[in-house]
Amino acid sequence: MCGIFGISSTKPISNQLIKGLSKLEYRGYDSAGISGHDINSKLVTIKATGPIKNLKHKLSKLKGITTAVSHTRWATHGQPTLKNTHPHLSEYIGIVHNGIIENYLDLKLYLKKKGYVFSSDTDSEVICHLMNYYFNKSADMQSSIISTANSLEGSYAIAAINSHIPHTIYTSCKGSPIILGKGVDANYISSDITPIVDHTKHFIPMDDSEFAEINSTSIKIFNKNKRTIRKPTKVSKINKNQASLMGHRHFMHKEIYEQRTIIQDMTSRFVGKNKILPNIFGHNTDKLLENIEHIHFVACGTSYHASLVAKDWIEQFTKITCTAEVASEYKYKKINVLPKTLFVSISQSGETADTISSLKKALKLSYTNTLAICNVAESTLTRLSGMNFLMNAGPEISAVSYTHLRAH
């Protein structure tokens, strides 16, 4: 999992990019990079291995840039080296990518035959060369990103800039999240809402196979036929102070010390004098859950361990039987769903790829209903699930998940 953050503004943005990437460091922290338009519309790129702070001493190269894309990486294809660090470049094009391109070897062979030279070991580099190839054919960036997306198999969130089209970012996603932020004299793209709320509460989540063209004054969303898609703007309920250190030494320190307050707050909101309050999963959900006899938990990592605890407690105190599965296993298994079974997905971010894939599979099966236990109201998981339980435990920026394990 990697993090993408981009800004198109009327003012210099280099420090904002570093701050935004820091909010995404839980998504990857083995290397980071930024690419933007200089005053002559040429692409200027900086990269560094290791944590995001290693980029800071290179920021002078980005002086004055107002439009750029940035990336923090957790390596999947290729070692965490400088040559494999995003952004990747191809003549006019610079791209950042989150996801896995399953047919990248076929695309790489095709592009090599067209004369393209590869400088990294990543699957992501095929995207920038492919986009450059299509742009050379069409001289139209919208057509180029559409043709590129049509050629890709797998999951992706892409943000791209073009030296021939200054002050503009192009983006698309499939199976990996992209959030668009609407500001004043600036617009934003991000892998999640956390970096955006520092600048604006107004956002638009993109859906799979949508495309967007962003500059400092406008956001245009369109489909593969270039037809404009009109989507409502949402307002985030996240308090930007929740995503700040608030006097703590670092975010791990903050998240350790705020556990007690968050659990007390959750208890006061969801637990009455003698029982859990009704409808905590939404309107009339208490009636929907009355006849549930089985629960199927699916999650990854820390959330999976929380589901094991829930399984033991539920079976100890009720007659409901439970199973708990790792999402990466569930999505490939043959599943026999018993009658009156509730599917429960658990994810702090609501963007865990395997958990989302499992939920999409579950929606095609005969579960009585689906419930997401999540911390982010604006996430893919909550949008897809029939019911939601929002922890409101504050954003996770440290990757250790102390608070969110307890909240789950």
What are the residue ranges of the model-derived segments?
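Anionic-ligand anchoring segments at beta-strand to alpha-helix junctions in alpha/beta enzyme folds, i.e.
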Residues: P177, Q264, S268-F270, N274-K275, ...
